[in-house]
């Protein structure tokens, strides 16, 4: 079982530093988590609250009739972009769980329509917020407009307004797909700056939808910086900043409201006797931070969120260990930032996301690429679900908590061990719907070869 590190202060001892530098799977537990979250959380010089999450959800609802008309795949849901909650008892062993340690579920964002990943949440929300703002400015909508009025934003007059503007983003893949597809569908000129580790099929999918793809030889951080700089020169360009955007973060947070209803519909309680553990793959941190913020706001002390990262790209763990006032890169730790989990190949975390998570996050853990491929196959064989390697990252989480001495010690210290049999473990799968069959076949072949 992977070794576990639990630093108790900002000054890290030699053991976790050595484990990170050796790219060994490890667990970090957050000593600054507050059981009761503040109603208003500080982030990036501002404050956000549950009201902001509800406003993001309301924006999705206002746009649902328009989205239903623009995207055929949303006709069955009335324009709602959501994913199912799936029982996964057949994956207990793969997740490191034994009898009496709780029930395993999957939040299947790998099935999300339009973008095929978790990025459909934040990315599409920011595009919709921009479209709404421009529509109000140009008289296409009024503050009194209802959801049916939003259908008019697909008309030629609205598209002519949107066509004057460029929506740009820097991405390793999935956020680019989300932003590019949504912006292009509404009539914006969409530009996606993609890092060297972005998959070719994702570039092709964007180009097929009329999105301009700018390829960069460097990593995610370089692609974002290039996109940000280019957009800054054009007053009609809106840059979706994955490292800094609150609109993205709040779009992700809206998932918590729907998940709360799904849990209730499934008869799953979340309280002191029925804790909820959520395991979220993490790249720069905006998506899992947004979801964690929303979950902590709606479910309080009894939800414990953990971020999963590749051993060569643990940017969020590195940032949380360093604390505020520092902004380390994985390169500073002698790591390569090279991983087949392209959506998680990020060298430096989002500072706003890290600031927001300091009192909310329970911990982070890292996984090897080989583990991702093995678990991708285990998910396929047990459930029939097809996910990307990065989407498998959360499946290692339960084993870190229940299968290691430090994990069990933490569960005891938090008063969670006596209630473990009634716990729910929720693995958030983040992408996979649009992976081409030939690419998935290579994933599966590698996973089966590993045994």
UniProtKB/Swiss-Prot annotation:
Catalytic activity: D-serine = pyruvate + NH4(+)
Residue numbers of N6-(pyridoxal phosphate)lysine PTMs: 119
Organism from which the protein derives: Acidovorax ebreus (strain TPSY)
Cofactor: pyridoxal 5'-phosphate
Highest taxon above the source species: Bacteria
Keyword Cell membrane in annotation: no
Enzyme class: lyase
Gene Ontology MF term list: D-serine ammonia-lyase activity; hydro-lyase activity; pyridoxal phosphate binding
Pfam families documented for this protein: PALP
BP term (GO), one: isoleucine biosynthetic process
Annotated NCBIfam families: D_Ser_am_lyase (TIGR02035), PRK02991.1 (NF002823)
Name under which the protein is recorded: Probable D-serine dehydratase
Record's keyword terms, sorted: Lyase, Pyridoxal phosphate
Annotated InterPro entries: D_Ser_am_lyase, Ser/Thr_Dehydratase, TrpB-like_PALP, TrpB-like_PALP_sf
Transmembrane among keywords: no
Family the UniProt entry places it in: Belongs to the serine/threonine dehydratase family. DsdA subfamily.
Enzyme Commission number(s) of this protein: 4.3.1.18
């Amino acid at each position: 079982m992977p070794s576990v590190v639990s630093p108790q202060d900002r000054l890290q001892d030699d053991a976790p530093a050595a484990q990170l530098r050796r790219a060994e799977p490890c667990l970090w537990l957050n000593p600054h988590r507050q059981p009761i979250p503040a109603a208003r959380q500080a982030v990036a010089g501002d404050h956000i609250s549950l009201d902001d999450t509800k406003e993001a959800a309301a924006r999705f609802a206002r746009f649902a009739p328009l989205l239903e008309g623009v995207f055929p795949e949303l006709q069955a849901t009335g324009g709602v972009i959501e994913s199912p909650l799936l029982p996964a008892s057949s994956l207990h062993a793969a997740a490191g769980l034994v009898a009496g340690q709780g029930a395993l579920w999957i939040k299947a964002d790998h099935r999300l329509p339009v973008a095929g990943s978790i990025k459909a949440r934040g990315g599409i929300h920011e595009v919709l917020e921009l479209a709404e703002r421009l529509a109000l400015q140009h008289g296409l909508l009024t503050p009194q407009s209802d959801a049916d009025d939003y259908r008019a934003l697909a008309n030629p007059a609205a598209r002519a307004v949107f066509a004057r503007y460029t929506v740009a983003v820097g991405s390793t893949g999935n956020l680019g797909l989300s932003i590019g597809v949504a912006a292009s569908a509404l009539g914006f000129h969409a530009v996606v700056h993609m890092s060297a580790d972005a998959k070719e099929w994702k570039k092709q999918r964007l180009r097929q939808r009329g999105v301009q793809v700018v390829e960069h030889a460097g990593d995610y951080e370089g692609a974002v910086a290039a996109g940000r700089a280019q957009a800054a020169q054009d007053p009609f360009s809106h840059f979706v900043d994955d490292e800094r955007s609150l609109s993205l973060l709040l779009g992700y947070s809206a998932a918590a409201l729907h998940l709360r209803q799904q849990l209730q519909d499934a008869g799953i309680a979340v309280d002191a006797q029925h804790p909820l553990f959520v395991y979220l793959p993490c790249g720069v941190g905006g998506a899992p931070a947004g979801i964690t913020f929303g979950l902590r706001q709606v479910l309080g002390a009894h939800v414990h969120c953990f971020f999963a990262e590749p051993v060569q790209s643990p940017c969020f763990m590195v940032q949380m260990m360093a604390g505020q006032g520092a902004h380390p890169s994985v390169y500073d730790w002698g790591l390569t930032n090279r991983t087949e989990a392209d959506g998680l190949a990020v060298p430096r975390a989002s500072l706003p996301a890290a600031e927001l998570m300091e009192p909310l996050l329970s911990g982070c853990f890292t996984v090897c690429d080989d583990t991702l491929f093995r678990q991708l196959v285990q998910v396929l064989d047990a459930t029939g679900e097809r996910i990307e390697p990065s989407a498998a990252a959360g499946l290692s989480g339960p084993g870190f908590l229940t299968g290691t001495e430090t994990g069990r010690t933490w569960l005891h210290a938090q008063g969670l061990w006596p209630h473990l049999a009634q716990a729910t473990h929720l693995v958030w799968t983040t992408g996979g719907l649009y992976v081409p069959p030939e690419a998935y076949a290579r994933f599966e072949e590698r996973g089966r070869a590993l045994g």
